[in-house]
């Protein structure tokens, strides 16, 4: 099983939405320097290879990892009939700054791990 909080599941999608600055160019050049592509490294494009239950959690106000990353992944996994549970933290940020969110996160993870381990 796997637990993922605020994942980047689509590298191409992320790169296309990132601010273009000098640091971005170095990052992009590094990632594109090998034979593999962003798509080959993106979980969103490798759904067929995923064969474990996944718990996916994300805050809907995450400014570091856009929630579309989780939504797209969940939708594609669900459509493929994969075992995935998706939890959105309303008004949640990337750092689980809200204490209630942290407690809820830990409870969800504990419940999921007890079920699959």
Question: Which role does the model predict for each range below?
Answer:
Residues 1-117:
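Active-site-proximal cap/loop segments of hydrolase catalytic domains
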